[in-house]
Amino acid sequence: MHIHKIQAREILDSRGNPTIEADVILTTGIIGRASVPSGASTGSREACELRDNDPKRYAGKGVQKAVKHVNNEINQALQGLSVEDQENLDRILCQLDNTENKSHLGANAILATSLACARARALSLNQPLYITLNQGDMMTMPVPMMNILNGGAHADNNVDIQEFMIMPIGAPDFPVALQMGTEIFHVLKSVLKKQGLNTAVGDEGGFAPNIQSNRQALDLLSEAIEKAGFRLGEDIVFALDVAASELFNEGFYHMYSENQKFDSHQLIEYYANLISSYPIVSIEDGLDEKDWSGWKQLTTHLGNKVQLVGDDLFVTNPKILREGIAQGIANAILIKVNQIGTLSETRQAIKLAYDNGYRCVMSHRSGETEDTFIADLAVASGCGQIKTGSLCRTDRTAKYNQLLRINELASLPYAGKNILKR
């Protein structure tokens, strides 16, 4: 299981922007391949995504520099090493980069290599990836957070909240959960059409109509759920990704579609009112990533009622998560492998969360590829929840389809309503 060669190439993501794909070729001829996603609303403390900044190619978004780093320094450093020791490989990658945010080699170059090594190991062992990724956690099939109505930075519309998600917690298993979500998605399209609303989709495959308010979005989802024959609050519950850092300006949170602005306390009250009106069980990035005093208030007021997920807040970084845990900030973390840049550091963040009673939600990015690594990692880590977009666009459904394959192989329990237990 030793590395013969590592080579990378520039490919396109789901937004038509360049990203990097790496092949780890073993001495046996086995090839492990992985590609890296890219975010639109990003946390300021994410690991550095290295771009070329050459205006003559891809409007500056090329990744040839990152590709060269893989083909040269990274290839030379890892040649001859075993893929059996993931932590050692990732440690060498971090030492080779030698920056706090992986800005020398690029987190995209490092991550593509890290994930490709893990995939090469699974292929060498002739085992499914989710099996070789498991480190003793109880594996479950995750509840999907299906982003079927998009706003914010993920859509070209006037909706403030970035993601309105449905969670089929009442399903008996993952295939039925996927079926439920898909049926609601198609009914929602007809509901929008009937009201003369746009049925074009955003980056993550959800519909992106211009509507009057965030409450109207939840009302539209409620109507679609009921018309599809499901019970709101029993079969299906809601989750929100506010991406509040995108709404924060000069000390206030601006809900432009509703012509309102809030300070932290007022926005917390706004959420409390929504929670009392709709079966919302999870709010992600409810406040700005730097508004830690506000986050403390939010956690104190609503942390015993809903899951409060830190995305931009924690950026899958164990060091930052540790600070949040110490201060009682949030009660869950979003896991995005490209925010931190290696598989090992991602695992560290997951373990730290579990050890301190925080939940984990596995997540894609808005600029995705056909790579399904996160589906296997969600199952392997037993996190119980996954965000991978809506029920259309192959970059999203690829992850759902991989989860169907895993479910068929493993007959694992579906997390379902267990995610609500505190």
From Swiss-Prot:
Gene that specifies this protein: eno
Reaction(s) catalysed by this chain's protein: (2R)-2-phosphoglycerate = phosphoenolpyruvate + H2O
GO molecular-function terms, A-Z: magnesium ion binding; phosphopyruvate hydratase activity
Cofactor binding note: Binds a second Mg(2+) ion via substrate during catalysis.
GO cellular component: cell surface; extracellular region; phosphopyruvate hydratase complex
Pfam short name (any one): Enolase_N
Source organism of the structure: Legionella pneumophila (strain Paris)
Keywords in alphabetical order: Cytoplasm, Glycolysis, Lyase, Magnesium, Metal-binding, Secreted
Cofactor(s) this protein requires: Mg(2+)
Enzyme Commission (EC) number: 4.2.1.11
Recorded family membership: Belongs to the enolase family.
Name of protein: Enolase
Superkingdom assignment: Bacteria
Subunit (UniProt): Component of the RNA degradosome, a multiprotein complex involved in RNA processing and mRNA degradation.
